[in-house]
Every structure is written in structure tokens, then in C-alpha cells.
């Protein structure tokens, strides 16, 4: 899930990841839960941020634990981050910082073939296109 607000996006990091690596937020759908409800709940649990305008982006099969990853964009309704217990860090990244991490600092973002990376790249390109 890529949460955005203007020219900033919300990314998080797990303690087990390599130093400085950040990615989109992620989670699982609970039984009986709508996908949009899962996005809203997971973002709230991991960051304290409320979201709106949840939009489906795409999917990717994931070998472990034999899952289907679904990518969504969501617009932030609130901006104040409340750190939880699930992630080591969650923070807002400016589009210029995000673009630099995508292009220059390998190992700081998810692998090229992941839906998380595709979400981040698509968001950067969209924000830059709006500025032209």
C-alpha cells in the first residue's frame, strides 16, 4: 500500500531489513474483510494514519507464504505518525528523496520486480508528471 499526501509518500521499515531499507506498508486481509477495509486497517495499525480514496493498482504472486500481493494507493487524511509495534520506523519521504533512493541507492528499496517497487516508481512518475 502506498500512502501519499501531496509530494510525500509514507514508507516503513522492519527491523530485520538491511540498514536504511524502506518499503510500502503491507499486511493481510482478515476473513470477511473487504480489501479497502484491510488497506485502511493495516495503514492505521502500522502508522496511525487515516486514509481515503483507496485505489487498486495491481497484483503479484508471492511464493511465501503462497500469497497474492495486491497493490493499492491511498491518500492520507491525517499526517501525524503514531509509531506502533509492527515496524521499526515509519516516515514521510519527499518525492525527490524517493526518486533518489529509487535510482541511486540500491538495497534501500524493494527489488525491481516487486509490486512495492512498482507502486513507488509509479507514484514518483505521477507526481513528476503533475509538476510539468
Predicted segments with their positions:
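Hydrophobic pocket-lining residues within nucleotide cofactor-binding pockets
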Residues: 29, 51, 76, 87, ...
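N-terminal strand-loop-strand
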Residues: 1-24, 50-51, 74-76
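Acidic, glycine-rich loop-and-beta core segments that form the ion-binding/anion-interacting portion
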Residues: 39-48, 56-61, 66, 89-92, ...
Amino acid at each position: 500500500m502506498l500512502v501519499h499526501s501531496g509530494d510525500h509518500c509514507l514508507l516503513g521499515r522492519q527491523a530485520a531489513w538491511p540498514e536504511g531499507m524502506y518499503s510500502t506498508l503491507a499486511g493481510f486481509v482478515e476473513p470477511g474483510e473487504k480489501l479497502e477495509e484491510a488497506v485502511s486497517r493495516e495503514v492505521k495499525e502500522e502508522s496511525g494514519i487515516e486514509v481515503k480514496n483507496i485505489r487498486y493498482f495491481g497484483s503479484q504472486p508471492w511464493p511465501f507464504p503462497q500469497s497474492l500481493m495486491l497493490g493499492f494507493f491511498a491518500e492520507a487524511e491525517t499526517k501525524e505518525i503514531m509509531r506502533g509495534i509492527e515496524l521499526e520506523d515509519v516516515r514521510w519521504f519527499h518525492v525527490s528523496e524517493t526518486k533518489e533512493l529509487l535510482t541511486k541507492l540500491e538495497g534501500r528499496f524493494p527489488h525491481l520486480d516487486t509490486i512495492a517497487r512498482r507502486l513507488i516508481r509509479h507514484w514518483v512518475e505521477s507526481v513528476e508528471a503533475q509538476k510539468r
